[in-house]
Design a protein with these regions (language model features):
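N-terminal secretory signal peptides that target proteins for export/translocation
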Residues: 1-11
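Charged, low-complexity intrinsically disordered terminal segments
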Residues: 28-201, 205-320
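Bacterial N-terminal signal peptides
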Residues: 14-26
Length: 320
């Protein structure tokens, strides 16, 4: 049985917690003057020139792109054609992502919950930036609570290229990085909204080559963690009907009011205004295994090996 002293202490702690939440709430909200200044600096510093002037934006040849062309050609409204393959191996799933990024001609849309600042996370981000520079429209949507807690990275991504857009879903207190005190306050004041996280994972190239399943962007999802790796499964689907469905799903999330551009986040904007951009490249994090990243990049250009993987694709009909 609790004593009067214990009950009184509990009430005081509860009052202090609510007071803390109220103080944090009073200070939340987008700093609009700062946002305008940061947006202006981003517009000024973000490059628009392209590394490629070809109409295909220097996309590499790909057996998967050929399957997409074949599915598009053979499909009819009443009888769509698709190709599908289950991706069981994490390393293979990462290899295909890098290959498909380099094979993209027009657009890449990526949606995820977790994005870590490790080997896999840096590699995919760097490849997406390179795709944007050659003319591909790149959009990334990640959950704020579990993606990229390095404000330096985010400030640099915001200015990487005019073809690259990055949004965070449901940011806490209009910031990219949630501090422990803010996390606790969110649980107290607004748990219902705070708990609405985005767990969807989608990787879509040119609106017709899509990967959906359980993998986020972190070493342990791609068999690259030396201590512990997840066993996940994804489905690679190629074709117009499924591609349109995946595109529509992404667009709904992208247009949602809780999908917030980086220049609407106070901590990112403060970093943008404090540190003029010296270079557009993301620095490789300390401890990253550069050798295995380079090895995977070479494999992503191996047309013979990738064609062998593409031969596993099964021709199917409707995908729902």
């Amino acid at each position: 049985m609790s004593t009067p002293v214990a009950r009184s202490a509990t009430r005081w702690l509860a009052c202090l917690a609510w007071l803390l939440a109220a103080v944090l709430l009073a200070g939340c909200g987008v700093n609009r003057p700062l946002a305008r200044q940061a947006a202006a600096r981003v517009a000024l510093e973000r490059p628009q020139q392209l590394d490629c002037t070809r109409s295909d934006h220097c996309a590499i040849a790909s057996a998967y792109a050929e399957l997409a062309r074949r599915a598009r050609s053979d499909s009819r409204a009443e009888a769509p054609v698709h190709y599908a393959d289950a991706l069981e191996q994490g390393n293979e799933a990462l290899l295909l992502r890098v290959h498909l990024i380099r094979a993209a001609r027009h657009s890449i849309d990526v949606q995820t919950c977790i994005w870590a600042e490790d080997d896999a996370g840096w590699l995919v981000l760097d490849e997406l930036i390179q795709a944007a520079r050659r003319g591909v429209k790149v959009r990334i949507l990640a959950d704020q609570l579990f993606a990229l807690d390095d404000v330096d990275w985010l400030a640099r991504i915001a200015r990487a290229h005019a073809n690259l857009e990055f949004r965070l879903y449901n940011p806490t207190f209009d910031e990219a990085v949630t501090q422990p005190v803010e996390f606790a306050a969110s649980l107290l004041c607004c748990f219902s909204r705070f708990n609405q996280r985005m767990h969807n994972k989608l990787f879509l190239v040119d609106g017709e080559i899509g990967i959906a399943g359980g993998r986020n962007y972190e070493n342990r999802y791609f068999d690259w963690d030396q201590q512990f790796d997840y066993r996940d499964r994804e489905l690679l689907v190629i074709g117009p009907h499924a591609g349109a469905q995946m595109q529509a799903s992404f667009e709904r999330f992208w247009a949602h009011p809780r999908a917030v551009p980086l220049t609407r986040l106070n901590d990112v904007n403060a970093r943008i205004m404090r540190e003029p951009l010296a270079a557009q490249d993301l620095a490789m994090p300390a401890g990253v295994d550069a050798a295995r990243i380079e090895a995977l990049r070479r494999r992503a250009l191996d047309a013979t090996a990738l064609a062998a993987l593409a031969r596993r694709m099964l021709r199917i009909g409707v995908v729902d």
